[in-house]
Amino acid sequence: MNSGILLIDKPIGYSSNQVLQKVKKKLSLKKVGHFGTLDPFADGLLILGIGKGTKLSNIFLNEDKAYVAEIFLGEEKDTDDLEGDTTFKSSQTVSYENVISALKNFEGQIDQVPPTYSALKHNGKPLYDYAREGNPITKPARKVIIHELKVIEFKFPKLMLEITCSKGTYIRAIARDLGRKLGIGGHLQSLRRLKQGSFDISDSK
């Protein structure tokens, strides 16, 4: 394949760039790019553009995405995911009804503050670099759209959601903000991307 699109089911433990480099080497490709990063702890659909296919990045990066997310309630972490240090812990429990009520605050267009550990840039430098140096920077809230939030399973402290959202949405931030809305903290425990635009994980290799 000299040009086109390749759909990968990214495994846990690899960065998006590591997967890209492995594919590039295995298929002896010169030009490869990915259309939407997945954190190393996350798995699921990763779209790669090959050759002239890399020019389609603007189209794919603007597409809606769907995920299955597992949120751990009762503990907040500095990275907003399972890999960070605990910053807040609560012994309080919440009911299914509490969760459903809180989730209503995350439907439709919302203002979302990006995680301080993210690849967003500040003066040309990724936010995660500032955070690791002990100088976290909080970016202004951005408008994102949550098209659907569906509870798959709830067994405290774990909540499994299916989320369909617009570009630029941080699922880690939803976990963080839901935990805060419930007053007990929360962080993202696992994440799997199911869809991006018209492409589905079932079409991947």
What does each model-identified segment do?
Residues 1-205:
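Catalytic/RNA-binding core of pseudouridine synthases
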